[in-house]
Amino acid sequence: MIWIAGHLVFSRTGLVRIVGGKVDEKPWNTLFRRGASIDDMLTYPDSEEISEQWKIVSDVLMTRLNELTEDELDQPSSFNVPAGEQTVRGAVAFLHFHETYHIGQLAYLRKHFGYSQLAG
């Protein structure tokens, strides 16, 4: 579960850059990139550190999303969007889908291991 949570922070950090925001990246951020090996969990930050970075990145992202203009959303994306428009808008839409997919994985794993549900 820790890898998925770290991957979500990694992805949100990337989205902050795509929408023109700035956030200080943690040195461990690249441990959670797409295709990263999960062999050495001892190098991972603890869940509290990941959670704290999630909050920081999310605050910056929400502020920047609320500031975006239609013109900015229509600009080409610096991220190669696998499906949909190759614009900032398309990147936001794709990464929103990506995030909900992984949050669903976390919810399923929590249930499987007997933890309380994430919400509700």
Model regions and ranges:
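Short, contiguous alpha-helical
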Residues: 1-37, 78-120
